[in-house]
Design a protein with these regions (language model features):
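N-terminal Rossmann NAD(P)H-binding glycine-rich loop of SDR-like oxidoreductase domains
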Residues: 4-24
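N-terminal Rossmann-fold cofactor-binding loop
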Residues: 31-36, 50-51
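Conserved Rossmann-fold cofactor-binding substructure of NAD(P)-dependent oxidoreductases
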Residues: 45-65
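N-terminal Rossmann-like NAD(P) cofactor-binding module of classical short-chain dehydrogenase/reductase
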Residues: 65-68, 101
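NAD(P)-cofactor binding segment of oxidoreductase domains
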Residues: 74-100, 138
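Substrate-positioning beta->alpha
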Residues: 80, 153, 180-190, 201
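Glycine/proline-rich active-site loop of Rossmann-fold NAD(P)-dependent oxidoreductases
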Residues: 110, 146, 162-167, 192-201
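Conserved beta-loop-beta element that borders a ligand/cofactor-binding pocket
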Residues: 140-161
Length: 207
């Protein structure tokens, strides 16, 4: 049975990822900054700390087989995702933990040129979104240069819709929207931990 650590496991998508892993009987660690948090499941180990602290990251990754990163953007620290991911990758290499699944966003990197003009305008006119995409771009560079068995997941706009039970990977069809349920994003991430189809690849997903 794989031991899995989820960074960002208390966020919108992260919580669902953790729930799905626990439902499979997995042993899960997750990091929280809330000192009063308590585990609600016998297979869930909560570590209190910050992803920017290397010692905390070392504690999280100790004896783990798979790392999942679903970090969110932090307005108070504009490079939390990239710096935190750099810490995670460094510790993974030191501890010989090789499998990494990292959540990014559609529009990051080379996918920017394929985005609708309306999307580009929205991002460029919003300083927070602009900073978030910059941080995601740096984060992806860290992952791609890591020599790990990585998968980068780029969802379209994540929405609170119910789980559809399916998703489209690396392509659009006429009947697809530029949105995806957060539950479907979480399911794809969970599916990826036992799937080699997207190792060292970027997977764009949408409904």
């Amino acid at each position: 049975m794989n031991n899995i650590v989820v960074f960002g496991g208390t966020g919108e998508v992260g919580r669902i990822v953790v729930e799905k892993l626990l439902a499979q009987g997995r042993i899960v660690k997750t990091l929280t900054r809330n000192k009063t948090s308590k585990s609600s499941h016998t297979n869930l180990n909560l570590i209190v700390g910050n992803v920017l602290e290397v010692s905390t990251v070392e504690q999280c990754i100790e004896s783990q087989d798979i790392v999942i990163i679903v970090l969110g953007f932090n307005n108070s620290s504009l490079d939390t995702m990239s710096r935190g991911t750099a810490n995670i990758v460094s510790v993974m290499l030191a501890k010989k933990c090789n499998r990494l699944v990292c959540l990014s966003a559609q529009g990051v990197g080379e996918s920017w040129e394929h985005m609708p003009d309306s999307f580009k305008t929205m991002v460029l006119n919003d300083p927070i979104l602009t900073a978030s995409f910059k941080d995601h771009t740096l984060q992806e560079q860290v992952v791609k240069n890591s020599n790990l068995n990585w998968t980068i997941v780029r969802p379209t706009e994540i929405v609170d819709e119910i789980e559809s039970g399916g998703y489209c990977v690396n392509g659009y069809k006429d009947n697809l929207t530029f949105q995806i349920s957060k539950y479907d994003v979480a399911q794809f991430i969970v599916d990826e931990i036992s799937n080699s189809a997207y190792v060292n690849k970027v997977a764009m997903i949408t409904n």
